[in-house]
Amino acid sequence: MNDINPAFVMPDVQSSRDTRQIPIQRVGVKGVRYPVSLKTPAGVVPSVGTFNLDVHLPAEVKGTHMSRFVALLEEERAPLELASFRVLLDKMLEKLEAEAGRIEVTFPYFISKIAPVSGVESLMDYEVTLTGEIRNGVTRVFLKALVPVTSLCPCSKKISQYGAHNQRSHITMNVELAGELPVEALVRMAEEEASCELWGLLKRPDEKFVTERAYENPKFVEDLVRDIAMRLNADERIVAYVLEAENFESIHNHSAYAVIERDKRLEPTA
């Protein structure tokens, strides 16, 4: 018999007291795939986000209300941008009756690009992550982008009579924001400092351009992170960052890798 007596009040087990007196820094749901709308320069476009949502749980409370995380995503369907993301973060803390919490959402982001010679247009996809957290009343927002580029080895070019080994590389920038920073602007910082950027569609004249451009602009993995770091350092919208470059070496079965981390609040003159 599944009938429920209207007079019966179901117990709220999660809100009961816990006697172990151990707080939990982060508890919530992970890997929730949900439709999102992205606010872009081209307008509002549909996408799919993978969400991780969690809150702080006080020592005296037994559990959090897991269903409320998903209910939040269903209720708050505004197009995703930095302003609406901050609102989503505030709403989560209100809904979960929490003092601290964190939201992370990863989604594919498409940018229309024009080939350098033929002018054909195509889409390039980038993996983008927005992370927001509230701790001790302070809100912090991070924008992360994984940007695929081409790198060409300066040493290989120098020692060879002709040619040089080159490969696809991944530039990952996770920046803490002090102001509005479009995804496109962050992506361009990486692409403009690579040996050459990538396009989704190229014709033969474009392939010639890309090959020669990379050859004329060789960079070690160390060069990549240093040159991009100079761009991040100069941008006042960015207060801190973790910058990674990984070259998938075409002549080895391993990658070359470099990382630069900086918090401008701790190193204001660096």
Swiss-Prot record:
Q: Where is this site: May be catalytically important?
A: C153
Q: Pathway of this protein?
A: Cofactor biosynthesis; 7,8-dihydroneopterin triphosphate biosynthesis; 7,8-dihydroneopterin triphosphate from GTP: step 1/1
Q: What highest taxon heads this organism's lineage?
A: Bacteria
Enzymatic reactions:
GTP + H2O = 7,8-dihydroneopterin 3'-triphosphate + formate + H(+)
One GO BP annotation of this record = tetrahydrofolate biosynthetic process
| Protein name per UniProt | GTP cyclohydrolase FolE2
The entry lists its GO molecular-function terms as: GTP cyclohydrolase I activity
Q: What class of enzyme is it?
A: hydrolase
Tell me the keywords, alphabetical order.
Hydrolase
- Known role: Converts GTP to 7,8-dihydroneopterin triphosphate.
Name the PANTHER family for this protein: GTP CYCLOHYDROLASE MPTA (PTHR36445:SF1)
Q: Name the EC number(s).
A: 3.5.4.16
Q: Which gene encodes it?
A: folE2
> Could you tell me which InterPro entries the record lists for this protein?
GTP_cyclohydrolase_FolE2, GTP_cyclohydrolase_FolE2/MptA
In the record, the note on similarity to other proteins reads: Belongs to the GTP cyclohydrolase IV family.
Look up the coiled coil feature and give its residue ranges.
Answer: none
